C-alpha cells in the first residue's frame, strides 16, 4: 500500500497495528465514551435548560459540551473497528471520522481561548463587567469559530483517500492516529498556526496579564469569590491545554516535518489518546462554572449512594431471614 510523503513521492503505508494498541484503544475509548457521554449530556442540559441567567461563559460552555458530544458519538465506530479489525461503514464515513480528529481540537482550543479572554475581562477589566452578560456577542463569536473550523476541515474530505480502501477486509486508517495527515503540509501548517498557536498565545497573554494584576494587588475591588473562581478556571484551562492539546499538536508538527514511511506511530497514537481525554476533563470546568451542574452531579452521587445503601439493607435483611429460617428448622 502506498501514500505520498512531503515531496509527493509514493512511500509504503504500513497498516499493521500492535495488539496492545488495539486493546488499549478499546479500553480507553470505552471509558471515555461512558464518562464523557454522561458528563456532557448533563452539562448541555444544565447550561441550555436549567440555567436562568445566561452569561458569556454559559454560552461557551454549551458549545464545549456540544463539540464534546459530537466527538464522543464517533467513539463506538472506532471501538468496533479496533474490535473487529475491519471497517464496514464505507470510505466516506471513514473520511468524516478522520476529519473530526482535526475538527475537535481546532474548535475546542478557540472556545477555551474565549473563556480565557472572558476571565481576563472579569479580573483585569471589571469596569466592563456588563459585557460578560452580553450573550449576543458570545453567540456570534461561537458561530464564527464553527464556520471557520468547518471551512478548513471540509477539504480533508476531498483531499485524502484511504490508501488501503481496496484491501480485504476494508480498513479505516484515518481514525487510528494522526500519521495520515502528512500529505498536504500547506493546509496543515495554516491550520496549526490559526487553530493552535493563535488561541494558545491568546490564552498565555490573558494568563500573564491576570497573574501580573493579581501579584501587584490591582484586583482589590474584585469580590473574593469571583477572583477564586476565575483562578480555578484559568488553572483548569492551562492544565487541559498542556496535557491534552499541546502534545497532539507538537506530534502533528513533527509528523509534517518528517519524511519516510508512514506507519504506526506510538507517539501519534498516545497523543491522540490524550486529545480524546479532554472530553472528560471538561467536567472540571463545568463543575467550577455552574452551581446547577454541581447540584446535578451531587444529586446523582447521592442517589447512587442511596441505591447502594438500599442494596446493603436488603442483603442484610435477606441474610437475617435465612439465618432465622435455619435456626427454626434446627429447633
From Swiss-Prot:
Major location (coarse): membrane
Stretches of the chain found on the membrane's Cytoplasmic side: 48-56, 117-138, 213-232, 290-331
Residues bearing carbohydrate: 14, 188
Record key words, sorted: Cell membrane, Cytoplasmic vesicle, Disulfide bond, G-protein coupled receptor, Glycoprotein, Membrane, Phosphoprotein, Receptor, Transducer, Transmembrane, Transmembrane helix
Bilayer topology term: Multi-pass membrane protein
Family annotation (CDD domains): 7tmA_NAGly_R_GPR18
Residue numbers carrying Phosphoserine: 322
GO MF annotation terms: G protein-coupled receptor activity
GO biological process: phospholipase C-activating G protein-coupled receptor signaling pathway; positive regulation of Rho protein signal transduction
Extracellular topological domain residue ranges: 1-26, 78-95, 160-191, 254-268
Disulphide bridges: 94-172
Cell compartment(s), UniProt: Cell membrane; Cytoplasmic vesicle membrane
Transmembrane feature ranges: 27-47, 57-77, 96-116, 139-159, 192-212, 233-253, 269-289
Protein family: Belongs to the G-protein coupled receptor 1 family.
Reported function: G protein-coupled receptor (GPCR) that plays a role in diverse physiological processes particularly within the immune and nervous systems. Becomes active when triggered by various endogenous ligands including endocannabinoid N-arachidonyl glycine (NAGly), delta-9-tetrahydrocannabinol or resolvin D2/RvD2 derived from the omega-3 fatty acid docosahexaenoic acid (DHA). Upon RvD2 binding, facilitates the resolution of inflammation, aiding in tissue repair and homeostasis.
Name assigned to this protein: N-arachidonyl glycine receptor
Organism: Macaca fascicularis
